[in-house]
Amino acid sequence: MLERIKDSFTESIQTKIDAAEALPESIAKAAEMMVHCLLGGNKILACGNGGSAGDAQHFSAELLNRYEIERPPLPAIALSTDTSTITAIANDYSYDEIFSKQILALGQPGDILLAISTSGNSGNVIKAMEAALSRDMTIVALTGKDGGAMAGLLSVGDVEIRVPSNVTARIQEVHLLVIHCLCDNIDRTLFPQDEQQ
Protein backbone atom coordinates (compact mmCIF):
# COMPACT_ATOMS: atom_id res chain seq x y z
CA MET A 1 0.00 0.00 0.00
CA LEU A 2 2.83 2.43 0.80
CA GLU A 3 4.39 1.79 -2.59
CA ARG A 4 1.07 2.49 -4.30
CA ILE A 5 0.83 5.81 -2.46
CA LYS A 6 4.39 6.71 -3.49
CA ASP A 7 3.59 5.69 -7.07
CA SER A 8 0.61 8.07 -7.09
CA PHE A 9 2.88 10.94 -6.08
CA THR A 10 5.47 9.97 -8.69
CA GLU A 11 2.85 9.66 -11.42
CA SER A 12 1.34 13.02 -10.45
CA ILE A 13 4.76 14.70 -10.54
CA GLN A 14 5.56 13.20 -13.94
CA THR A 15 2.19 14.28 -15.36
CA LYS A 16 2.85 17.82 -14.15
CA ILE A 17 6.33 17.77 -15.72
CA ASP A 18 4.78 16.64 -19.02
CA ALA A 19 2.09 19.33 -18.70
CA ALA A 20 4.73 21.98 -17.97
CA GLU A 21 6.23 21.19 -21.37
CA ALA A 22 2.94 20.92 -23.29
CA LEU A 23 0.56 23.51 -21.83
CA PRO A 24 2.12 26.94 -21.08
CA GLU A 25 1.27 28.49 -24.47
CA SER A 26 -2.37 27.41 -24.38
CA ILE A 27 -2.70 28.52 -20.73
CA ALA A 28 -1.20 31.92 -21.57
CA LYS A 29 -3.54 32.30 -24.56
CA ALA A 30 -6.56 31.36 -22.45
CA ALA A 31 -5.55 33.83 -19.72
CA GLU A 32 -5.11 36.58 -22.31
CA MET A 33 -8.59 35.85 -23.70
CA MET A 34 -10.06 35.97 -20.19
CA VAL A 35 -8.37 39.30 -19.45
CA HIS A 36 -9.75 40.72 -22.72
CA CYS A 37 -13.21 39.40 -21.82
CA LEU A 38 -13.14 40.97 -18.35
CA LEU A 39 -11.76 44.29 -19.60
CA GLY A 40 -14.64 44.37 -22.09
CA GLY A 41 -17.18 44.21 -19.27
CA ASN A 42 -18.02 40.57 -19.92
CA LYS A 43 -18.05 37.53 -17.65
CA ILE A 44 -16.81 33.95 -17.50
CA LEU A 45 -19.24 31.04 -17.10
CA ALA A 46 -17.79 27.71 -15.96
CA CYS A 47 -19.17 24.17 -15.96
CA GLY A 48 -18.23 20.55 -15.39
CA ASN A 49 -19.42 17.38 -13.62
CA GLY A 50 -18.22 15.84 -10.36
CA GLY A 51 -14.65 16.90 -9.68
CA SER A 52 -14.84 19.16 -12.72
CA ALA A 53 -17.89 20.88 -11.20
CA GLY A 54 -15.72 21.47 -8.14
CA ASP A 55 -13.05 22.94 -10.41
CA ALA A 56 -15.62 25.24 -12.05
CA GLN A 57 -16.71 26.45 -8.61
CA HIS A 58 -13.11 26.85 -7.48
CA PHE A 59 -12.29 29.01 -10.51
CA SER A 60 -15.40 31.14 -10.01
CA ALA A 61 -14.65 31.62 -6.30
CA GLU A 62 -11.08 32.73 -7.04
CA LEU A 63 -12.35 35.38 -9.47
CA LEU A 64 -15.32 36.56 -7.41
CA ASN A 65 -13.31 36.77 -4.19
CA ARG A 66 -9.57 36.90 -4.86
CA TYR A 67 -6.68 34.62 -5.72
CA GLU A 68 -3.45 35.83 -4.07
CA ILE A 69 -3.63 39.62 -4.27
CA GLU A 70 -6.13 42.16 -3.01
CA ARG A 71 -8.24 43.37 -5.92
CA PRO A 72 -11.86 44.10 -6.87
CA PRO A 73 -14.16 41.11 -7.53
CA LEU A 74 -14.24 39.79 -11.10
CA PRO A 75 -17.43 38.42 -12.75
CA ALA A 76 -17.52 34.62 -12.96
CA ILE A 77 -20.40 32.19 -12.52
CA ALA A 78 -20.16 28.44 -11.88
CA LEU A 79 -23.18 26.81 -13.51
CA SER A 80 -23.06 23.76 -11.22
CA THR A 81 -24.11 25.49 -7.98
CA ASP A 82 -27.86 26.15 -8.27
CA THR A 83 -29.48 22.84 -7.32
CA SER A 84 -33.04 24.12 -7.90
CA THR A 85 -32.21 25.16 -11.46
CA ILE A 86 -30.18 22.03 -12.22
CA THR A 87 -32.83 19.62 -10.91
CA ALA A 88 -35.67 21.51 -12.62
CA ILE A 89 -33.93 21.35 -15.99
CA ALA A 90 -32.87 17.70 -15.50
CA ASN A 91 -36.40 16.72 -14.46
CA ASP A 92 -38.33 18.69 -17.08
CA TYR A 93 -35.93 18.27 -20.01
CA SER A 94 -32.74 16.24 -19.61
CA TYR A 95 -29.50 16.18 -17.67
CA ASP A 96 -27.67 17.05 -20.88
CA GLU A 97 -29.31 20.49 -20.83
CA ILE A 98 -28.49 21.56 -17.24
CA PHE A 99 -25.73 23.92 -18.37
CA SER A 100 -26.88 24.85 -21.87
CA LYS A 101 -30.19 26.34 -20.70
CA GLN A 102 -28.34 28.51 -18.19
CA ILE A 103 -25.94 29.66 -20.92
CA LEU A 104 -28.82 30.53 -23.25
CA ALA A 105 -30.25 32.69 -20.44
CA LEU A 106 -27.04 34.24 -19.10
CA GLY A 107 -24.48 34.12 -21.89
CA GLN A 108 -23.75 37.18 -24.01
CA PRO A 109 -21.45 37.81 -26.98
CA GLY A 110 -17.97 38.42 -25.62
CA ASP A 111 -18.44 36.15 -22.59
CA ILE A 112 -16.24 33.07 -22.14
CA LEU A 113 -17.29 29.53 -21.29
CA LEU A 114 -14.75 27.55 -19.26
CA ALA A 115 -15.81 23.99 -20.14
CA ILE A 116 -14.18 21.27 -18.02
CA SER A 117 -14.21 17.52 -18.71
CA THR A 118 -11.39 15.03 -18.13
CA SER A 119 -12.59 12.85 -21.04
CA GLY A 120 -13.84 15.63 -23.30
CA ASN A 121 -17.01 13.61 -23.80
CA SER A 122 -19.44 14.85 -21.11
CA GLY A 123 -22.78 15.27 -22.88
CA ASN A 124 -23.96 18.25 -20.85
CA VAL A 125 -20.62 20.06 -21.28
CA ILE A 126 -20.78 19.46 -25.04
CA LYS A 127 -24.33 20.91 -25.07
CA ALA A 128 -23.00 23.86 -23.04
CA MET A 129 -20.35 24.47 -25.69
CA GLU A 130 -22.95 24.34 -28.45
CA ALA A 131 -25.09 26.87 -26.55
CA ALA A 132 -22.05 29.11 -25.99
CA LEU A 133 -21.28 29.05 -29.71
CA SER A 134 -24.88 30.03 -30.48
CA ARG A 135 -24.45 33.04 -28.16
CA ASP A 136 -21.17 34.12 -29.84
CA MET A 137 -19.15 33.25 -26.76
CA THR A 138 -15.54 32.10 -26.76
CA ILE A 139 -14.63 28.72 -25.26
CA VAL A 140 -11.72 27.62 -23.10
CA ALA A 141 -11.86 23.82 -22.79
CA LEU A 142 -9.97 21.92 -20.09
CA THR A 143 -9.72 18.31 -21.24
CA GLY A 144 -7.50 15.25 -21.07
CA LYS A 145 -6.98 11.96 -22.87
CA ASP A 146 -7.59 12.61 -26.62
CA GLY A 147 -9.76 15.70 -26.08
CA GLY A 148 -12.92 13.77 -26.90
CA ALA A 149 -15.85 15.30 -28.77
CA MET A 150 -15.17 18.67 -27.15
CA ALA A 151 -11.98 19.10 -29.16
CA GLY A 152 -13.98 18.85 -32.38
CA LEU A 153 -16.27 21.74 -31.42
CA LEU A 154 -13.50 24.29 -30.98
CA SER A 155 -12.72 26.93 -33.60
CA VAL A 156 -9.63 29.06 -34.21
CA GLY A 157 -10.73 31.64 -31.61
CA ASP A 158 -11.12 29.04 -28.86
CA VAL A 159 -8.49 27.31 -26.73
CA GLU A 160 -8.13 23.70 -25.62
CA ILE A 161 -5.89 22.97 -22.65
CA ARG A 162 -5.50 19.19 -22.94
CA VAL A 163 -3.65 17.45 -20.12
CA PRO A 164 -1.23 14.83 -21.52
CA SER A 165 -2.60 11.89 -19.52
CA ASN A 166 -5.21 9.15 -19.73
CA VAL A 167 -5.66 8.85 -15.94
CA THR A 168 -8.66 10.79 -14.64
CA ALA A 169 -7.14 11.59 -11.23
CA ARG A 170 -3.93 12.93 -12.79
CA ILE A 171 -5.92 15.02 -15.28
CA GLN A 172 -7.97 16.52 -12.43
CA GLU A 173 -4.81 17.37 -10.50
CA VAL A 174 -3.38 19.24 -13.46
CA HIS A 175 -6.72 20.96 -14.14
CA LEU A 176 -6.53 22.49 -10.66
CA LEU A 177 -2.99 23.72 -11.33
CA VAL A 178 -4.12 25.15 -14.69
CA ILE A 179 -6.94 27.01 -12.93
CA HIS A 180 -4.44 28.49 -10.49
CA CYS A 181 -2.18 29.52 -13.40
CA LEU A 182 -5.14 31.19 -15.13
CA CYS A 183 -6.10 33.08 -11.96
CA ASP A 184 -2.50 34.17 -11.37
CA ASN A 185 -2.13 35.42 -14.95
CA ILE A 186 -5.47 37.25 -14.83
CA ASP A 187 -4.61 38.95 -11.54
CA ARG A 188 -1.08 39.97 -12.51
CA THR A 189 -2.17 41.29 -15.89
CA LEU A 190 -5.12 43.30 -14.60
CA PHE A 191 -3.47 44.38 -11.36
CA PRO A 192 0.33 44.46 -11.80
CA GLN A 193 2.23 44.13 -8.54
CA ASP A 194 5.73 45.07 -7.50
CA GLU A 195 7.59 41.75 -7.80
CA GLN A 196 9.42 42.59 -4.55
CA GLN A 197 6.18 42.18 -2.56
UniProtKB/Swiss-Prot annotation:
Binds 1 zinc ion per subunit. Residues 34-196 form the SIS domain. It is found in: Cytoplasm. Pathway: Carbohydrate biosynthesis; D-glycero-D-manno-heptose 7-phosphate biosynthesis; D-glycero-alpha-D-manno-heptose 7-phosphate and D-glycero-beta-D-manno-heptose 7-phosphate from sedoheptulose 7-phosphate: step 1/1. Its main location: cytoplasm. Its EC number is 5.3.1.28. GO terms for molecular function: carbohydrate derivative binding; D-sedoheptulose 7-phosphate isomerase activity; zinc ion binding. One of its GO terms (biological process) is carbohydrate metabolic process. Zn(2+) binds at H58, E62, Q172, H180. It comes from the Bacteria. Catalyzes the isomerization of sedoheptulose 7-phosphate in D-glycero-D-manno-heptose 7-phosphate. The reaction produces a racemic mixture of D-glycero-alpha-D-manno-heptose 7-phosphate and D-glycero-beta-D-manno-heptose 7-phosphate. Homotetramer. This is Phosphoheptose isomerase. It comes from Shewanella sp. (strain W3-18-1). The gene is gmhA.
